Amino acid sequence: MRLLVSCVDSGSIKEVLCNIGTDTSVQSALQPFHVAPHLAEGLKAYVDRMWVISEDEAILARNSGVVELVKISKHLKENEALQVDPKGESKNEKSLSDDLPKFDISEFEITSSVSDLFDDAKLESLSSKSVKRTKLVDGFVTLCPIKKDSSNNTFVAATKSGLLHIIKKGEDKKLIKLASLGLKAPVEFLQLYDLEDTDTDKYIFAYGGEENLIKLVEIDSSFQSLKQIWEAKNVKNDRLDMRVPVWPMALRFLEPSPGKTEKGKLNYQFAAITRWSHLTKYSTQHGRKPFAQIDLLPNREPLSQMEVFDAKGENVVSLLGNFQSETCNDLNVISTDYKKNVFKFDGNGRMLGKVGRDDITGSSTYIHVHDGKYLLQGGLDRYVRIFDIKTNKMLVKVYVGSRINFIVMLDDVEIEMPLSPSAKAAKEKQKRKVTELEEDADELWNKLEGKVAASKASKKSKI
């Protein structure tokens, strides 16, 4: 497995190469083959968001307001020193190369960047109104291609202050800022819609935040203007006739509502997680209020993130994280609180369990479901973990020495381990045995075919 991990304390990204079963907290367990930092720029410039464009290119968004294009090159890891066997004799180079696993490691080079993408002044006036105890600071909430085609060279970079930047990678491999548009702040999330082929000259996305109701926005292909096409409405007052606070934290689209639809009304469906531990479900055909609001936690403990996956174990999540289904029947949700819990819920809000409940010791600052198979998790306890999405079993645990902000899995290919001399001999013996059995089978079939041919020939001669 090859991972890229955003490390907050050093402002670097670390490349981690490991196999299933790796656990750095256990001395006798399998250890990672390679952990190395790259592009360190310090605490004030850590990587907020990453998007891998291809095997040799990625785009990074840092909390200093900079978006960078990074070239990735790979080369075979060189053995820096000879191993010494228990007798104290140095192994020769051929023996060393046979005993160590072989794998490629990456080098990273910044080839282009765009800066000054934040507006902290816009958040200053909102800090006094926020229930947060700390000053609001700008940061990136989204970095992704504007089309669902992963090879697309035009990206959306959205910030907490409500700035929506359209950035393009030119033919000369340089980043160009095409446009900057404004949204209502503060923004906790911005989610693009990619579940069906819409008009090529329009793009749809949803956004929201603290006291900022969910809105659907349409942007044209020229990126010069945007239009709000729908806005949610708050639910009715609670049983004490108190206003329910608004704070959507994350959202995922579903496919359009099936069956009969009312003409003239938009047809979008989505589910959202709120700060106050509600799972809300919307259909624009139904109206502006959610058609379902479910309390996920009894004491309304704050939730911060949202990932979705299919209850049947199939990969039905789009490139941008939306759920490729018309209903919530098979929808499962993963969310995190600000303590140490990673919760799994079904589409009706029933808790299915906690992931890593006996191992995670700090708040999870990042979770992501990869290919419908793995849950990537990292946080304040400085460990990268990979869990099996079905069984919740921990597959990988690697200490990276820093708070974690983002994780990307480049591949899940296992690195082949070299065999000991006895294992090699056993493997060769088994290989010879299989070859002998195949040769014996071929010889037997040839004899049978020869007898059949001779029998047919004798019958013809008698006739």
From Swiss-Prot:
<keyword id="KW-0539">Nucleus</keyword>
<dbReference type="GO" id="GO:0030687">
    <property type="term" value="C:preribosome, large subunit precursor"/>
</dbReference>
<dbReference type="GO" id="GO:0006364">
    <property type="term" value="P:rRNA processing"/>
</dbReference>
<dbReference type="GO" id="GO:0042273">
    <property type="term" value="P:ribosomal large subunit biogenesis"/>
</dbReference>
<keyword id="KW-0698">rRNA processing</keyword>
<comment type="function">
    <text>Involved in the biogenesis of the 60S ribosomal subunit.</text>
</comment>
<keyword id="KW-0690">Ribosome biogenesis</keyword>
<dbReference type="GO" id="GO:0005730">
    <property type="term" value="C:nucleolus"/>
</dbReference>
<comment type="subunit">
    <text>Component of the pre-66S ribosomal particle. Interacts with NOP7, RRP1 and RRP5.</text>
</comment>
<protein>
    <recommendedName>
        <fullName>Ribosome biogenesis protein NSA1</fullName>
    </recommendedName>
</protein>
<comment type="similarity">
    <text>Belongs to the NSA1 family.</text>
</comment>
<dbReference type="InterPro" id="IPR037379">
    <property type="entry name" value="WDR74/Nsa1"/>
</dbReference>
<dbReference type="InterPro" id="IPR036322">
    <property type="entry name" value="WD40_repeat_dom_sf"/>
</dbReference>
